[in-house]
Amino acid sequence: MSKQYVLDSWALLALLQGEEPAAARVKEILLEGERQQAALLISIVNLGEVYYRVGRRSSRATAVDTLNQIRSLSLTIISASDEMMLAAADLKLEYAISYADAFAAALADHTGATLVSGDPEFDQLQSRIKVEKLHRTLK
């Protein structure tokens, strides 16, 4: 498999909330993963971010259901190892990004994968990692 994507929480939240055109692109990427045309990765830290954001908007029960749905996807969840923690912390030292975003960026940097997000914090990292910038229509 030559294509690899790291999904940031922004991408999954856009899908869950039906924010187009980002949601359609995330669906396409997930389909590529299901068809084994691409490897799909997410940091456990970013998965936790999806969980708490869904829980805040809805309920803990909805967040648990969402987490179970995400775990059923063709998506490899990467733990926060010492190596990833240090890589994320080094990115946080160098760039003005959130700590959770630093984990997504560190994973993309480590694997050479394309980071999929609409978060503008990643704009400053485009010389270092590949970023597929998602967009949503403003309401």
Regions found by a protein language model. Give the residues of each.
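Helix-loop "lid/cap" segments that line or gate small-molecule binding pockets
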Residues: 53-54, 74
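A generic structural signal for short hydrophobic patches within well-formed alpha-helices
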Residues: 12, 47, 122-123
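Anion (oxyanion) recognition and catalysis
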Residues: 34, 71, 109
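Acidic, PIN/NYN-like endoribonuclease modules and their adjacent C-terminal/linker elements
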Residues: 2-4, 105-139
